[in-house]
Amino acid sequence: MESFSSKSLVLQAEKKLLSKMAGRSVAHLFADETSSEVLDELYRVSKEYTRSRPQAQRVIKDLIKVAVKVAVLHRSGCFNPSELALATRFRQKLRQGAMTALSFGEVDFTFEAAVLASLLTECRDVLLELVERHLTPKSHGRIRHVFDHFSDAGLLTALYGPDYTQHLGKICGGLRKLLDEGKL
C-alpha cells in the first residue's frame, strides 16, 4: 500500500522553499526588528573576526535556515511529546546562554569563554537531538556550523574584548529586550 500524505508534501515544499530563500534580508520577514538587529550585529562580529564576508554571510544564512526550519516543524505539529520536551529544554538552555552572555557583558571581569562555549555546545547537542528525525544531514551540518562558529573561544574572547565593545553593547541590548519581551 502506497502511503501518501499531502501534509508531508507541503512540509517538504515549505522547507525546500525556505532553504532557497534564507538570507539576511529574509530574516526580517521571519524575525521581529530586535531579532533582526541582533542577527545583523552577529554578522558584523563574524565578518570582522573572520575577515571574510562570505564566511560571515554563510554562518548567518545557516542560522536563519535552521531557525526557520525548526519553526516550520514546530508550527506544523511535527514534534512528538518527547521532542516537545527537548524543544523546551533547548529554549531553556538558549535563554540561560543569553542571560550568561548578558551577565558577562554587564559585569566587568566576569567573562569566561569556556562557560559560554559549553552552554552553546549544550544548545547544539539538544537541537541536534530534537531535529534528528526531521531534518537532513545537511541541515545537521548547518546546526554544527552555526554553534561551532559562535562557541569558538577566540571569537568569544574577541567579542568580550576592547575592540568589540560597541558590537557587544548592541548584542546585549537586543538580548535584554528579547528576554524582557519573553521572545527568547
Curated annotation (Swiss-Prot):
The name on file for this protein is: Tumor necrosis factor alpha-induced protein 8-like protein 2
What is the originating organism of this protein?
A: Bos taurus
Q: How does it assemble?
A: May interact with CASP8; however, such result is unclear since could not reproduce the interaction with CASP8. Interacts with RAC1.
Which Gene3D superfamilies does the entry link to? Answer: Tumor necrosis factor alpha-induced protein 8-like
Modification Phosphoserine, positions: S3
For biological process, the GO terms are: innate immune response; negative regulation of inflammatory response; negative regulation of T cell activation; regulation of apoptotic process; T cell activation
One Gene Ontology cellular component annotation held by this UniProt entry: nucleus
Question: In the UniProt entry, what is the domain comment?
Answer: The central region was initially thought to constitute a DED (death effector) domain. However, 3D-structure data reveal a previously uncharacterized fold that is different from the predicted fold of a DED (death effector) domain. It consists of a large, hydrophobic central cavity that is poised for cofactor binding.
Q: What's in the keyword line of the UniProt record? A: Cytoplasm, Immunity, Innate immunity, Lysosome, Nucleus, Phosphoprotein, Ubl conjugation
Its PTM note reads: Phosphorylated by TAK1/MAP3K7; this phosphorylation triggers association with BTRC and subsequent ubiquitination and degradation.
Subcellular location(s) of the protein: Cytoplasm; Nucleus; Lysosome
- State the similarity comment: Belongs to the TNFAIP8 family. TNFAIP8L2 subfamily.
- Pfam (any one): DUF758
> Could you tell me what this protein does?
Acts as a negative regulator of innate and adaptive immunity by maintaining immune homeostasis. Plays a regulatory role in the Toll-like signaling pathway by determining the strength of LPS-induced signaling and gene expression. Inhibits TCR-mediated T-cell activation and negatively regulate T-cell function to prevent hyperresponsiveness. Also inhibits autolysosome formation via negatively modulating MTOR activation by interacting with RAC1 and promoting the disassociation of the RAC1-MTOR complex.
Q: Which domain of life is it from?
A: Eukaryota
